[in-house]
């Protein structure tokens, strides 16, 4: 009878969990690092390279990702068709305008292990450019992952009371003119 009581525990351990991750104002590399751990199942104590125990990851707002510095124009994605003269290069800004999901997808694809399980793991990744997620995926969601980076508030999001209560580092003298 002991094996019957352990069966539900084993199914709960290997069950697939659906995680939601918001990509708004987040760097693609940080999203990829967080998602690849969940897709592979590295966060589970029963993880093994040959066991398929990864979870589903749903990432929304991929249209609103953020790069630091001038990476929108400096980062180049390249591909080759295999034919002479088939080498193509496109900047991150051009690729993002064409397909707002592609940058996050390529970042996660690059973070996954380079073996035969890679495409199977990518099938458990669900990317959406905005907050519109289909109803059949929404009902499967079980947990929301915290964003890897804190999103800063814009200046127009502060109230006048918060601005006045903010500590002043320097106060100008009476005869100072702007």
Swiss-Prot record:
GO cellular component: mitochondrial inner membrane; mitochondrial large ribosomal subunit; mitochondrial ribosome; ribosome
Main location: mitochondrion
GO terms, biological process: negative regulation of translation; translation
CDD domains in alphabetical order: Ribosomal_L13
Entry annotated with the keyword Membrane: no
Subcellular location: Mitochondrion
GO molecular-function term, one example from the UniProt record: mRNA binding
SUPFAM superfamilies (UniProt xref): Ribosomal protein L13
Keywords from the named record: Mitochondrion, Ribonucleoprotein, Ribosomal protein
Pfam families referenced in this protein's UniProt entry, alphabetically: Ribosomal_L13 (PF00572)
InterPro entries linked: Ribosomal_uL13, Ribosomal_uL13_bac-type, Ribosomal_uL13_CS, Ribosomal_uL13_sf
Keyword presence, Cell cycle: no
Similarity-based family: Belongs to the universal ribosomal protein uL13 family.
Subunit structure: Component of the mitochondrial ribosome large subunit (39S) which comprises a 16S rRNA and about 50 distinct proteins. Interacts with OXA1L.
NCBIfam families, sorted: rplM_bact
Protein name: Large ribosomal subunit protein uL13m
Organism: Bos taurus (Bovine)
Phylogenetic lineage: Eukaryota, Metazoa, Chordata, Craniata, Vertebrata
Annotated gene: MRPL13
